Each structure stands twice: as C-alpha cells, then as structure tokens.
C-alpha cells in the first residue's frame, strides 16, 4: 500500500486552476467548516497564525476526509519543523522567505527521504504512515510531497528564474505583503511599482513550467493574476471573512 495520493500536487502539476483559503485562526472547527465548502485547498498558517504542532495536527485531522486539500505554511524552512509537519500528515508545505535557488534546493532536500533528500526517518511512529499501517509509505512518500516556496523580497523576485527551476519545487508563491514592505511601500500591496514586479514574477514562474501563485482577494486581482499566468490563488482568509461579516452585521444594526 503506497502513501496517500496528493490530489493537490496532481492538480498543480497538470496546470489546473486552484483556488484556496488561508486559515489563521488556529481553529479545527473553522478548518472543518472551510474544508466542506468546496475550496481546492486550505492553508494552515504556522508562520503568522498562533499555531503550534498539536494545533496543526488538529486542523489536519479536521480537513481529512474533506474535499479540500490541506497545506501547512511553516514559520521557516528548517529541517526540524518540515520533518515534524510532514510526520503529522501534511503532504503539501509552503515555506516562506526563500530568496535563492540554493535555499529552495535545501527546502526540497529537507522534505524528501534519501536518496533525493535528508528527511529524518521515523515514519513508523507517526500519523503520516497511519502509524505504520501503510507498508510502502517510506518508498512512495517522496512522490506525494508537494513543495511550495514563497518569494517575498526583491532579491527573491530577481532569482525566480533559477528558484522555479529547482527540481522538486512544484509551485512558487509570491507574497505581496512582505514584497511591498521590502520595496518601501509598506501595506501598499497594490502600489503600481509592486504590481509591475509581481507581474514579471508571475510570468517568470509560468515560463519555468511550475505553478505560479499569489494572494488575490478581489475579483479584479484574480482576473489580473490569472492573465499573468497564475494558477494557484489565495482568494480569502478566515480572519478577513469573519471580520467583514462582523462589520457588516454591526453596520446593519446601526441602521435600524
């Protein structure tokens, strides 16, 4: 019996459009609710969300069996956290602040068992192998691991042609918030200069033959980035959905 099929990776590699939701509230209930609503993927945010390993595991369980695929964003691309998140059962990881092809290759190596990488071997003890109930897990896990690297500085954007061609990198995701800050336009994600850099980045990623992703909360942004070759878009977040609903409800009350 092989490792579970990663349908998100298959979709990404085939060029199929994938729309997803950011989960930052660290809530299994929210994850379960989001997973039942037809998004292609939900990302559990371990970088900015208040997520530790037990909370990440709870949300992975909540998404298991749902039609939505789970992604975990780790705080940084260190071996120990990638190993533990993969052992928890995540098959797709997003690693922030990757700036060079060398860093990207290092991330891929940390996610793969030998001989392709150096992921620590403890699969018999963990959820990823259904606690050793998947006999061929170790031999088949590598092909089901999906690696997404996040580029979010000017240095990284200039290095996209090399980063995107690293074997084992399946998707390059542009982070507009940190990118805008790095360019001197803090919190101005739609500044014209920022959009020019993102547009070139999206085209460079697509030209390398891997999935190009970014954040696109508005229909206008979604159309723009799809037109630039984007196939992997974050279209909302649990926090913004909840906040906007609260504000709309309060506004409606004030009008009565």
Regions found by a protein language model. Give the residues of each.
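Expand to "…catalyze enediolate/carbanion chemistry for C-C bond making/breaking, isomerization
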Residues: 1-256
């Amino acid at each position: 019996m092989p490792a579970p099929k990663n349908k998100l990776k298959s979709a990404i590699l085939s060029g199929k459009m994938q729309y997803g939701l950011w989960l930052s509230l660290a809530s299994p209930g929210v994850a379960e609710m989001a997973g039942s609503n037809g998004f292609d993927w939900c990302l559990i945010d371990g970088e900015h969300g208040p997520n530790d390993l037990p909370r990440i595991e709870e949300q992975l369980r909540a998404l298991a069996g749902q039609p939505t695929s789970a992604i975990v964003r780790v705080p940084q691309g260190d071996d120990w956290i990638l190993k533990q998140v993969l052992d928890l059962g995540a098959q797709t990881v997003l690693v922030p602040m990757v700036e060079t092809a060398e860093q990207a290759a290092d991330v891929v190596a940390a996610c793969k068992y030998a001989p392709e990488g150096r992921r620590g071997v403890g699969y018999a003890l963990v959820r990823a192998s259904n606690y050793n109930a998947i006999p061929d897990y170790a031999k088949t896990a590598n092909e089901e691991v999906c690696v997404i690297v996040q580029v979010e500085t000017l240095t990284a954007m200039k290095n996209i042609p090399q980063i995107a061609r690293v074997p084992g990198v399946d998707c390059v995701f542009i982070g507009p918030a940190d990118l805008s800050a790095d360019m001197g336009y803090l919190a101005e994600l739609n500044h014209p200069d920022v959009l020019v850099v993102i547009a070139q980045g999206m085209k460079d990623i697509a030209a390398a033959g891997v999935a190009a992703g970014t954040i696109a909360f508005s229909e206008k942004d979604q159309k723009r980035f799809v037109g630039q070759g984007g196939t992997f878009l974050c279209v909302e977040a649990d926090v913004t959905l909840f906040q906007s609903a609260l504000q709309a409800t309060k506004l409606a009350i004030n009008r009565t």
